[in-house]
Amino acid sequence: MTPLVGVDEAGKGPVVGSMFVAAVRAPTEALPDGIDDSKRLTDDRREALADRLRDADRIDVAVVECQPADIDDANMNDLTVAAHAAALDGVAASGETVLCDAGDVDAGRFADRVAAAATLDVSVAAEHGADGSDDLVGAASIIAKSARERHVEQLSEQYGAVGSGYPSDPTTKAFLREAFEQEGGFPPCVRTSWSTCERIRAEAEQTDLDGF
């Protein structure tokens, strides 16, 4: 059965900032041309499509934000399932079919867990790479990525250059080291349970020991 709702996340891996899960409900003919996995789109194209998706009368959009404190306090797999369920609950109707981009190595298990966590009686399927193969999931990936990028821009305005937020980003690592050196800890926008933060703490402790 053709899905009526697509769900995807953005920002699962970064050490800085929130994760966002978006759900999009629409008849496929209502979706604008050019929908694709958000990672394949230029920033300008992604934002133009996100604006059209948010503004269209026949398209319903829901976004769930998982803040760093929530991520630090929870199991990431459990939180991802709960956020997908909350997002689809925001737009779906009972009896409808939902397709998620699988957030687990076992796509079937992920679908079953999301269905169990949802308050609505919906049929949930999950596929790896669905953001590139299904237009509704692609639309959800665009909305989620747009929300994440706007969030990172706001963090940069508040804290200065934070980079992309990913652990491999030199700007992000420099931001984390400087914040820890100056404050003795990390600001609320940081996922302090990430191994990147643990390494920075360990480096600082070793530096202190070397000073004796």
Curated annotation (Swiss-Prot):
One of its GO terms (cellular component) is cytoplasm. It comes from the Archaea. SUPFAM superfamilies: Ribonuclease H-like. It is found in: Cytoplasm. One of its GO terms (biological process) is DNA replication, removal of RNA primer. Its main location: cytoplasm. GO terms for molecular function: manganese ion binding; RNA binding; RNA-DNA hybrid ribonuclease activity. It catalyses: Endonucleolytic cleavage to 5'-phosphomonoester. Pfam families: RNase_HII. InterPro entries: RNase_H2_suA, RNase_HII/HIII, RNase_HII/HIII_dom, RNase_HII_arc, RNase_HII_hlx-loop-hlx_cap_dom, RNaseH-like_sf, RNaseH_sf. Manganese or magnesium. Binds 1 divalent metal ion per monomer in the absence of substrate. May bind a second metal ion after substrate binding. Keywords: Cytoplasm, Endonuclease, Hydrolase, Manganese, Metal-binding, Nuclease. A divalent metal cation binds at D8, E9, D101. Its cofactor is Mn(2+); Mg(2+). The keyword Manganese applies. Gene3D superfamilies: Ribonuclease H-like superfamily/Ribonuclease H, Ribonuclease hii. Domain 2. Its EC number is 3.1.26.4. The keyword Membrane does not apply. Endonuclease that specifically degrades the RNA of RNA-DNA hybrids. Belongs to the RNase HII family. NCBIfam families: ribonuclease HII. This is Ribonuclease HII. It comes from Natronomonas pharaonis (strain ATCC 35678 / DSM 2160 / CIP 103997 / JCM 8858 / NBRC 14720 / NCIMB 2260 / Gabara).
